[in-house]
Amino acid sequence: RVFRKNIKVWACADRNNTFKESVQETLLGKSTSVGTGMLPMSRGNAPGIVDIVTKPNTGGMVDLIVVKSDMSKQPSIISSRTYEQGVKAFYGAAVDAIWEDEESDSTIHNECLLRTMTTQGIVILTYTPLHGLTPLTLEFKETATLLTEGMD
């Protein structure tokens, strides 16, 4: 999907440490070589990372990533969230894209779906169902069954 405007993104993980070691490294690259992950550093007028703000007392966990795009004059913002912050950390904002890395509980996932409702945004989940058939995993399983039953 291509967004043709500046967007607000949430990148989420279960804990600060998991976020830093997985999501942050995927987006930015290793801490010693920022800009080697999915998002390059901006050079001159080129698209890419223009600013990174870290959370205090987290050993370098990112709070915000400001990304310049060639699609919009305004930058896009990627904010971090963790499930250990609780569902209240997911209240209130209209968000264009949310990446849930590792399984969240159903209340957080449902809140993420609500955050993207007014923007026609997307929610992406990347997880292995290590906790078995949780309500969230069962929801996907039931949806997949309904979709495949109608395909003859």
Question: Where would I find each of the regions flagged by the language model?
Answer:
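Phosphate/NTP-binding elements of NTP-utilizing enzymes
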Residues: R1-D152
